[in-house]
Amino acid sequence: SKKMIGVDTIEHIETLCAGGNLDNIDLKIKDMSRDGNFQISRDLTAANFGKLSDMATNEDIALGIANMVGETIAMLAVFAARSYNIKTVVLTGNLTAIKAINNVFDDLEAHFGVRFVIPELSQFATVIGAALADIEK
């Protein structure tokens, strides 16, 4: 994100995301056809950054990055969960602390039949796991 929008802290990224508009960045299914005869939601992303133009603001780009990261994580999780017939995925790590990414998980739950759970203080799960692994040694 630093090369694209000049910021690299979660706080700054979240601030930018709050003012962004994905309609200025992502190409949606609804942008490609007017008839609406689709088996999937017209609001799903067809191409991340598919509508990027010189008019996009840093806020739009920040939200586009967060959305792309969230959608990538969500879809990989959906495909992995489906291959094992799992309906619930628990997400942990620093990215779960970014509201714009969490919103992606909320939006995609209904579309793909997988429930995403983000525990409280989930950004610390990796550290806790490492500490517990060290104790077991």
Where are the model-predicted features located?
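Glycine/charged-rich beta-loop-alpha catalytic/anionic-binding loops adjacent to active sites
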Residues: 56-60, 109-117
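Glycine-rich phosphate-binding/hydrolytic loop that grips phosphoryl groups
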Residues: 1-5, 116-137
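Adenine-nucleotide phosphate-binding core of ATP-dependent small-molecule kinases
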Residues: 38-88, 123
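Glycine-rich phosphate-binding loops at beta-strand->alpha-helix junctions
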Residues: 78-108, 122-123
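Acidic-glycine-rich active-site phosphate/pyrophosphate-binding loop
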Residues: 43-53, 99-112
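C-terminal region/appendage detector
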Residues: 15-18, 72, 117, 122-124
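Glycine-rich phosphate-binding loop plus the immediately following alpha-helix
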Residues: 1-25
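Carbohydrate-associated surface elements
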Residues: 17, 27-30, 38-43
